[in-house]
A protein has these predicted regions:
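Acidic, small-polar-rich N-terminal luminal/periplasmic segments of exported/outer-membrane proteins
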Residues: 3-150
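Short strand-turn segments of transmembrane beta-barrel domains in outer membranes
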Residues: 143-169
Length: 169
């Protein structure tokens, strides 16, 4: 008869920033595809957490990019902005680590409200080793919110200048 074995494990720290009231995240993996802290990541990175989004009232991804060091925004039409870093256009944009194609006319996918995102991870510099082909500008990873263990409901409303208003649930 075989002896009894006990197996135990801890859940991987996913780096969820919602509800943490923190301006940093314990782990991010956009730069190396490994769950490393920002301090352990060997590239220039910025993480915009849910708390910072709420505190600074960053409603759109454009608002987030305006508050990110090293990112320049150029207008390429009405509601079609292009993000640039280090003199190059940022073409490397991912949702939860999966690449998306912005196509010829900008990024309609980038017009979404920030309510669905937990955090935005920006890696400045060449990310071709881990992201595939690209230019030496930056890589942007939009990390969506994850379901919680307990039921959770929130309703937020906002209003501002320039016909800026909305409601999220």
């Amino acid at each position: 008869m075989l002896p009894e074995i006990s197996v135990s494990a801890q859940a991987e720290n996913s780096g969820v920033s919602e509800g943490s009231h923190s301006y940093t995240t314990p782990v991010m993996n956009t730069a190396t595809k490994l769950p490393l802290s920002i301090r352990e990541t060997p590239q220039s990175v910025t993480v915009i957490t849910r708390q910072r989004v709420e505190d600074q009232n960053l409603v759109t991804i454009n608002d987030v990019m305006q508050n990110t060091p090293g990112i320049a925004i150029t207008a390429s039409g009405p509601q079609r902005d292009r993000f640039n870093a280090r003199g190059f256009s940022i073409d490397n944009i991912t949702f939860d680590g999966l690449p998306i194609s912005l196509g010829q006319y900008g990024g309609d996918a980038l017009l979404a409200d920030m309510a669905i995102y937990d955090r935005i991870e920006i890696v400045r510099g060449a990310a071709g080793l881990t992201q595939g082909a690209g230019n030496p500008s930056a890589a942007i990873n939009l990390v969506r919110k994850r379901p919680t263990r307990d039921p959770y409901l929130s309703v937020d409303g906002y209003a501002g200048n320039w016909d800026r208003y909305g409601l999220t649930a």
